[in-house]
Amino acid sequence: MTTETRDIVVVGGGTAGCFAAATAAQEGLDVALLERKSEDEGGHIACGDAIKGKSTFPDVIDRDYLREEAFTNENIQRALFLNPKGEDIDIPFGDASGAVVDRKRYGEVLLEEADRVGADVHYDTVVQDVTQNGQVTGVTATREGDRVEYDADVVVDAAGSLSLLQDKTDFEGTTFDTNVDYSQFCSAYREVIEVPEPVDYDDAIVFKPTAELGYLWYFPRSDRIINAGLGFQMNKPSFPLVDVLKDDLETRDEFEGATVKDKLGAALPTRRPYDSAVAPGYMAVGDAAGHVNPTTGGGIPGAAKAGHWAATVAGEAIADGDVGEDNLWEYNERVQRDFGKRFAAMDLFNIYGGAHSVDEMTDIVTALPGQMLIDLMGKKGSASLSLAGKLKTGVVTAVKTRGHWGTLYEAYQVNKLATRLKDVYDEYPTSPSGFEDWKADRDEIMDDVYAVTGADPKY
């Protein structure tokens, strides 16, 4: 077995891993990025491909190059909800336009950029274990058939959902969140499909409800290349994703005579971000730390930020000669006070939805005003359910939701709890010493959520 010694070892060459490696390299650290796939397959990851735009990315790579190479459709102006029970719902984005990318090329560019700025990218490297001695000290892996031990001051876990590294690491006595279960994840499958004629929704991301609180999507990379996929919550009975997608595509005229160019599946978190994603010598980022919007599955912007912040904080800790939890804690604080609080708030609506049937949720979504849906699914993480707003649209909404008033009132209560929850996340502790008290405050709100919705505890 050969041994390599680095400042930082990043495991996983997705969005979070590449931004962590690029950031570390830009700061002059000796960093190795371990990617299990071959160089040809690097960047080939199951994804819906929709993002908000290149401005969401930290400026540690050539963002213009990324845009030119991978952003195939920058004209996403609306979300279209295909309603099986009535009129489709068209929600404009206004100034917040989005984009759809070629995910394979996007991933290739990130790996290229990490290499260009100084990270050593090791392809065909499969990590099998974590080394520890009172703290995480590195990983062992097989690289192109040879055993390699990577020693590092900090290991950045960017290995994705249900990370193997977390199974191998002893977190006893640390703050690292181990309250993780498969039921907090979603199973997803997507195909990239070329259609014979241009579609009329190349300016939209299209959603459609499926069984078990999942959704089916059509995201246009162009007017003739569509990313079509679906997912379901793992805490619900499973259903055959491939067959369900196939059956749906067969009902849509635009897919007649279409060609499947690629297909891939994956698990992704549909839970709040990990309460703490650090342990001595160890940091988790991206899907490996639950950095995904639990209602939409969107995770690219959060992963990019998390990778960047983790490497920045790790570099400072290494310079101090102390990579304990106290010195890595600022990373937790940055995540939780930024997108973490919004994702945690959105998770309440996931819990609420899971306590009701898909049909009931569809009826309610159909009846709600469009702006309310924008607020719920957008940046705010809560809806504008003010008294004035309710009075303004109350008559129409009340008539449309007849028979579901109790469930709609639950949504109103959950929305208020989501606002309270974000306030708690704004007070995320500045050091591990306040962590237990903070969790107690947060868990009081979660108890209220379970009482209001009747849902089984998720955590």
Model-based region annotation:
Residues 315-459:
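C-terminal helical "tail/cap" subdomain of flavin- and related membrane-associated enzymes
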Residues 13, 115-254:
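Predominantly flavin-linked oxidoreductase catalytic cores and closely associated redox partners
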Residues 27-29, 37-85:
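N-terminal FAD cofactor-binding segment of flavoenzymes
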